[in-house]
Design a protein with these regions (language model features):
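Extracellular glycan-associated modules
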Residues: 1-191
């Protein structure tokens, strides 16, 4: 089993959601805080899951295996107020966590990673205070040159949906609803 996840994150405030884990993304079920006291962690499926730990600038990677439902990897002291790239690379039972193209943690899983058929969720329960960019998945372990090229490209800085007035979709216009002219052209705002 091999795969790689890559995401750019910008954390700007650790006080947001104080005392709970802050969700970045996970692949699995949608069960955050539904069956237990609110912690911010999804359970049981994290294949993988990436979170910010409570009250510290640490990242938590959770990976399910057939031997252990939650194997946890902590990456300490990630930078605040700047973009960082986080990659989770799995080959067989080895998990490598990269920060900005450098391996910061290597963890040997107790068993084969458990792959689930769940969806990918981002920023659940309000996520974290900051930004996310370019969440990518590959069904193989990326090599060092590919990892470095992703870091060199940097995050996508284009905001999606940041200003609804720029797009001016016609279905927000009331002209089509209130027009009484009988003309389809007038009723639909001049189509």
């Amino acid at each position: 089993i091999e795969f790689t996840w890559s995401v750019w994150i910008y954390i700007d405030d650790l006080d947001y959601g104080a005392g709970t884990y802050k969700h970045i993304f996970h692949k699995g079920n949608d069960d955050i805080n539904f069956t237990q006291a609110p912690t911010g962690l999804n359970h049981p499926n994290n294949g993988p899951g990436l979170y910010i730990t409570p009250n510290k600038n640490n990242l938590l990677v959770i990976m399910n295996t057939f031997e252990n439902i939650e194997e946890k990897i902590i990456v300490e002291d990630v930078p605040l107020n700047k973009w960082i790239n986080v990659m989770i690379r799995v080959e067989n039972t080895t998990v490598d966590v990269y920060i900005n193209g450098t391996i910061t943690k290597r963890h040997e899983l107790s068993g084969v990673p458990f792959q689930n058929y769940g969806n990918v969720y981002m920023s659940m329960n309000g996520g974290f205070s900051g930004y996310t960019s370019n969440l990518w998945y590959w069904d193989y372990g990326l090599g060092t040159s590919h990892i470095q090229s992703i870091v060199d490209q940097g995050p996508n800085m284009t905001m999606v949906g940041s200003n609804m007035t720029e797009s001016k979709p016609r279905y927000f216009s009331l002209r089509w609803f209130f027009a009484n002219t009988g003309s389809q052209q007038d009723a639909y705002g001049g189509i």
